[in-house]
Amino acid sequence: MMNLSKLLKLACLGAGLLAATVNGYSWGQKGHDVTCAIAQKHLTKKAKKQISEILDGKSIVYWANWMDNASHTPEFRHTSTWHYKNIDADETFENAALNEHGDVIRAIEEQIAALKSGKLDKEGKALALKFLVHLTGDMHCPMHMGHRSDRGGNQWQIQYFGSGKNLHSIWDSSLIESAHKWTYTEWVEQIDTYGKAENKAIAEGSVSDWGRQTYEISKEIYDETPVGSKLSYDYVSRWTPTIEQQLLRGGLRLAAILNDIFK
């Protein structure tokens, strides 16, 4: 469990950070906006009201990308390992070596526990919420469950439409932009189309269950994307349904988490 006094001490970060663009940690700005917009759409009235009060009238979409910026500052550098969980090819999800500084699964579980504890004041709740809404998106980005040996695909070099890239970077943002030229609201309109029963089924399970599911996808990606691969339209077409699926899963599961916390 994280130190609650530290949560309170580090509750705020200058608004100027929100203008920065950092793609090194996660889905990229649009992916996190989509995840949080889907979650916002599925919040109960009670959860939406409480969250709005905690965030001073802002929705969770407003804070979707805040943590990527914050993790690059001295105050929040300790959260840099929270964005991912590295699992090497010879490990299983269950027996992967733990990072002493934390990982995305543990960090999500800690934010949930902190928000349910009743021990946080408004600023502490706001900080935990900002972490939680971002990390839930990270957990559904496949290369955030990548191999430790190549730093989650950061050292897995490929060609993407003729340009040198690494596997992590194309899964963070390049594929989303190549898949559809949509705004984040258009993404929500197009992929959040299931009925209540399907949405409920997607939201079932634990944080670890969801992380394991993402890890299984990352294994497929590694298998189908050897180092040096030359990727273009076929690759985008192959993986677009997975991107849509993971963004939807992240949004619906985030809504389920928040509705349970603020019931």
Regions found by a protein language model. Give the residues of each.
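Bacterial N-terminal signal peptides that target proteins for export
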Residues: 1-11
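N-terminal, motif-rich segments that launch catalysis or mediate targeting to/interaction with membranes
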Residues: 25-135, 142, 147-263
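Hydrophobic helical h-region of N-terminal Sec-dependent signal peptides
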Residues: 12-17
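N-terminal signal peptide c-region/cleavage motif recognized by signal peptidases
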Residues: 20-23
